[in-house]
């Protein structure tokens, strides 16, 4: 018997090793632990690491990387960046491993701006610090991976020529925005009119929707550019958002791992993943959510280095004013760091993320805690005695004041179309529902608050059965992908040369990326707990914020494509582990070569998997047997 899915809509720079910490980051961010250091010597923790052998990948403490791995470009080595590996002799810059005033024999050297910056960040503090021969690659690699991702996302973007899955909601809402600035109702045959190229059948009554406006405004942008009467117009923004996300994940991997090779790996893996590809080729909200979340993470990553540069410069200025280094008083709390502009950018991006879907609120909480922990550890490494209390007061409170109000104002601003209208849903609710004691609030604010309360009740009570609903327990293994589209063309239909054919869109993830990424998360957890690498913790924070909250709502109707919000972090986690496999440039040639072969094999398998599943990702017409061959699990049907 032929089995077919039932398409339906839902209701409702030099490389840094993941294995070894950044300069000075011998412990997890905010852990409060530091290496015991002999004056002027290397830390005991680093000597212990050396005795166990070199840590994989191009370590943050060994700032050399080859392109390709195993080769050292001329002039690549940066002075003062060789630390003990396997018992070798180290060259340590002044103050490199001196992590507090009480342990320091030469404070005047340890608290210079150069020594502090190297201890807190490392010599390669931005792409400008890369050797001239490699600066171009810092931008070229993300660009090339984005071009690949763009080709996959924009090619045949207008296929199929129909509203796919929840496009029936969001595309029509977006067209309402283009026409009226708010959601309006549609007649029963609206989908047929859209497909026929006649979207101008809007009704005059408002439509009740339960998601904020940002994603729909972004879809509307594509329709404004290319028209709302064709699939390319209503899918353009989703494809663009997916392409930009590929660029960002590659750039973030370059920044996070300080490795050109791993930047290319991360960009390639996201570019070819089927789950992200499908979400980038259909106008649902989730790909926009993923974009703004990843952009916020990137901004906070930039702020991490910027804050440490400020701390180094201001602490060095205080030290320079005192003979023999900073005074004990200066090291009690450390300096204020002033306005953190990248945190403003992060607040803006998080506001846009929440304005796309409320589930972004969990990322706001996770990222807020993460950035404060980074600052606490920076003060600890710099030698601030009361680093915890000082970090909370001088970094934590400013972070809250900077990020949260900006995100809140941005979120409210996304409702501008609703505010400017007179007929939007619940727009006049406060006028007909006076509230004694609350009349000091503008009616528009009271009406919007009521709208949000009703939407919250809807989400809490969303528990209707759906043939493609899936439990979060199955997401990482792609247990139940959602069928977005399925048709059975007959022989004679263009592309169909057999009796029965299939044309499907199934957002099934690349098995190498998702199954390998799931294993990688377990390894990251051990690496974060055991090696206390802040990068592993940051990646896990992104996955946890997008994944774990769904377990709190076991009765709610959920779908696997919600996972695209944290998929970039899953890719970063897999890239991290591939970096461990690859090894670092100081490893023996045989070790680097074997690691390179394994990583290359993984990438080749990932590319082959995408090529194999590509027809069912993009609605190509294939024979039924070819379609059935790609349904690896019964739950995929």
Name each model-derived stretch.
Residues 236-257, 295:
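Transmembrane-helix motifs of polytopic, lipid-linked glycan transferases
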């Amino acid at each position: 018997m032929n089995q077919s899915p039932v398409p339906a809509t839902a209701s409702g720079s030099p490389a840094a090793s993941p294995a070894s910490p950044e300069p000075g980051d011998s412990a997890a961010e905010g852990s409060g632990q530091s290496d015991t250091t002999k004056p002027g010597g290397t830390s005991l923790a680093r000597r212990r690491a050396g005795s166990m052998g070199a840590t994989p990948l191009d370590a943050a403490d060994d700032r050399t990387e080859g392109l390709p791995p195993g080769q050292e470009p001329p002039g690549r080595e940066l002075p003062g960046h060789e630390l003990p590996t396997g018992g070798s002799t180290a060259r340590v810059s002044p103050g490199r491993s001196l992590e507090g005033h009480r342990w320091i024999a030469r404070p005047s050297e340890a608290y210079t701006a150069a020594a502090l910056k190297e201890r807190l960040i490392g010599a390669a503090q931005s792409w400008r610090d890369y050797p001239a021969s490699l600066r171009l690659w810092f931008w070229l690699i993300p660009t090339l991976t984005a071009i690949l991702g763009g080709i996959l996302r924009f090619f045949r973007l207008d296929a199929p020529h129909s509203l796919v899955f929840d496009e029936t909601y969001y595309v029509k809402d977006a067209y309402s925005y283009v026409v009226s600035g708010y959601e309006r109702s549609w007649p029963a045959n609206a989908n047929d009119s859209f497909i026929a190229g006649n979207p101008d059948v809007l009704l005059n009554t408002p439509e009740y929707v339960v998601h904020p406006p940002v994603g729909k405004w972004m879809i509307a942008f594509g329709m404004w550019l290319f028209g709302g009467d064709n699939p390319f117009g209503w899918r353009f923004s989703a494809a663009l958002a997916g392409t930009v996300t590929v660029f960002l994940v590659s750039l973030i991997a370059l920044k996070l791992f300080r490795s050109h090779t791993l930047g290319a790996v991360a960009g390639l893996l996201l570019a070819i993943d089927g789950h992200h590809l499908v979400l980038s080729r259909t106008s649902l909200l989730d790909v926009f959510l993923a974009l703004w979340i990843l952009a916020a993470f990137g901004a906070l990553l930039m702020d991490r280095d910027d804050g440490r540069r400020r701390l180094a410069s201001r602490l060095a200025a205080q030290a320079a004013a005192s003979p023999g280094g900073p005074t004990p008083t200066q090291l009690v709390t450390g300096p204020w760091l002033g306005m953190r502009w990248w945190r403003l950018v992060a607040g803006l991006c998080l506001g846009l993320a929440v304005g796309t879907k409320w589930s972004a609120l969990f990322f706001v909480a996770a990222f807020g805690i993460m950035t404060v922990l980074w600052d606490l550890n920076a003060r600890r490494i710099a030698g601030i005695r009361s680093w915890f209390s000082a970090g909370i007061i001088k970094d934590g409170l400013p972070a809250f004041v900077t990020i949260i109000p900006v995100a809140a104002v941005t979120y409210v601003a996304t409702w501008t179309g609703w505010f400017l209208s007179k007929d939007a849903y619940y727009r006049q609710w406060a006028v007909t529902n006076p509230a004694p004691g609350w009349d000091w609030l503008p009616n528009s604010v009271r009406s919007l608050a009521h709208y949000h309360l009703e939407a919250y009740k809807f989400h809490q009570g969303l528990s209707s059965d759906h043939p493609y609903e899936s439990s979060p327990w199955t997401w990482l293994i792609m247990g139940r992908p959602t069928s977005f589209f399925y048709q059975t063309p007959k022989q004679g239909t263009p592309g169909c040369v057999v009796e029965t054919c299939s044309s499907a869109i199934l957002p099934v993830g690349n098995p190498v990326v998702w199954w390998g990424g799931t294993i990688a998360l377990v390894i990251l957890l051990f690496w974060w707990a055991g090696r206390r690498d802040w990068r592993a913790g940051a990646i896990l924070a992104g996955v946890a914020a997008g994944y774990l909250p769904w377990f709190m709502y076991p009765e709610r109707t959920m779908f696997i494509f919600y996972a695209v919000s944290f998929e970039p972090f899953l890719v970063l986690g897999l890239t991290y582990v591939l970096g461990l496999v690859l090894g670092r440039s100081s490893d023996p040639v045989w070790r680097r070569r074997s690691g390179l072969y394994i990583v290359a094999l993984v990438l080749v398998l990932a590319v082959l998997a995408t090529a194999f599943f590509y027809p069912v990702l993009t609605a190509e017409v294939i024979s039924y047997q070819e379609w059935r061959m790609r349904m690896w699990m019964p739950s995929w049907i």
